Amino acid sequence: MKVSYGITVHNEAEELKRLLNILTNKIDKEDEIVICIDGDDEKVESVVGEYLSENEAIVYKRKLDGDFAAQKNSVIENSTGDYVFHIDADEYPSDGLLEYVKPILEANDIDLIWVPRVNTVDGITEQHIQQWGWRVSDAGWVNYPDYQSRIFKNSPEIRWKSKVHERIFGAETFSHLPPNETLSLYHPKTIDKQEEQNNFYSKLM
């Protein structure tokens, strides 16, 4: 079984470097990394260039043009694996998730796996929590398990839809991983980054 780890990146150079370091040390040789770059960020290009000097990956540029679904669909179209595991550049998977992703897929003939995500926002205040209607645990996790549709068969029928707050369609069978931090994606960010993203999304809607 071959898994394509698809990454979309804009200007998250340090986050991309962290993610690539994690994947390089954990994924199997037959797997692949697919990187879709939006824009011309020199730091991102430097990180990718450094990675390609010692590793292989499918890398291409594509403008977002306000359409997140089309951007993610382009990753699928450039992937050759049996399954696609989509990860945003500012996220990273737990070691346990990477370790068990293939055994889980091999034991379950399903189209889609929903993955729990640990969101943390450095600098968040009670005012932010009330304003956005978030649930925050004692550990500081926002809206956990915040399930994400990220691991799916590489099939022509399965594609993302909606320009903003995109959702995946075409999967007939699916399952949810248990809400366990050892099987989660991690999504840390600062409050400044959160507010920047909120403003960007509001302009697109």
Say what each PLM segment does.
Residues 12-26:
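Short, well-formed alpha-helical segments that are part of the catalytic scaffolds
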Residues 69-76, 92-205:
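Catalytic-site signature of metal-activated, phosphate-bearing donor transferases
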Residues 49-70, 74, 78:
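Conserved donor nucleotide-binding strand/loop of the catalytic core
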Residues 7-9, 37:
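Short beta-strand/turn micro-motifs composed of small residues
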